[in-house]
Amino acid sequence: ATECTVHENYKAKILKANDLATVITGQITGHPVRVIKNKLANAFLAAEKEEGSKENPDMARFDQLGTGALQKSVKLGDVDNGSVMSGQIAGMVNKEESCSEIIEEIMAKFNELVK
């Protein structure tokens, strides 16, 4: 939404996403997160694959990768090295609208369906 305070690069990354743009990272930590694929997501997935095969995975590695990652993308606009959290629905978001426009569109479709 236009009222959303995330960095413009974050919004642009969501708008460019397609239906295959997201992956789940963090499963090894017990805190899975769906994110848009980028350098950080790829590094996280590679670390999970490597550490997941070990009897005693180096969990500090995930702390190092994740610390400050959301701030990088949300506040600083680094959508390559930051965590760009997004659901699978990102591929269906194709324009930025105000909250009121989004709600009006939802209600119009609802009213159309209940006739």
Q: How does the language model describe each region?
A:
Residues 1-115:
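Conserved active-site-proximal phosphate/metal-binding subdomains
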